[in-house]
Amino acid sequence: MTQESYDYANRHGLRPISWNDFHGLCQAIALAAAEFKPEIIIALGRGGFYPGTLIAHLLRTEIYPVRLSRRVNDVVVYDDPVWLLDPPALVQGKRVLMVDEICDSGQTLQVAVEKLVAMEVAAVKTAVLYSHTWGANIPDTIGLITDALLLNPWDREAVVDGRIQFHSEYVSAFAQQGIPLEDTLRIPATKFELAKRP
């Protein structure tokens, strides 16, 4: 099945992910990844930085960021993923766990794995927090398979006109599915006054 990335009209339902859900998914992935004994974790940014960092802490493994994306400044600008930050040369000869947030088409993971294989890693495995059904055959490890619209705790809000508001991409996705925009879907964060600011 061919599926357009970011086509939110084809999502079925809504799945808010809490910070507790995120932590539990990362724990499950870390336990599975421990059997592989990764020497390095490569986190695909931006979304993969969150799970990659927690999984690296759980496994007490070194982590390195890479940027392979269709997006620049949160806007889709490329038809195919483009390398913005390559993996480090020190991956050569190492067992690498590549971590991303989601597998949609699978193209980003495939391009990244091809690059690591070309860099002569000893072995590479992939892990994602989530996959849609049409991409589930790509990652080695998946925390959750769903075709729902996923609301991550780290990207559902953005600063707009000096205020924290729903991210515009989610607002559009809600509209495409006919889902009402409700404050209950926002992150119930504690409000802080800064101790110091410039």
What is the meaning of each model-derived region?
Residues 2-9, 114-198:
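PRPP-dependent phosphoribosyltransferase catalytic core
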Residues 58-96, 105-113:
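Short, glycine/charge-rich flexible loops or terminal/linker lids adjacent to PRPP-binding catalytic cores
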Residues 39, 94, 139:
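Conserved acidic residues
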Residues 37-45:
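Short glycine-rich phosphate-binding loop at a beta-alpha junction
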Residues 1-37:
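Active-site-facing substrate-recognition patch
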Residues 33-37, 90-92, 120:
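Glycine-rich phosphate-binding loop signature in dinucleotide/nucleotide-binding domains
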Residues 40, 64, 97, 125-127:
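A structural signal for isolated positions on well-ordered beta-strands in alpha/beta enzyme cores
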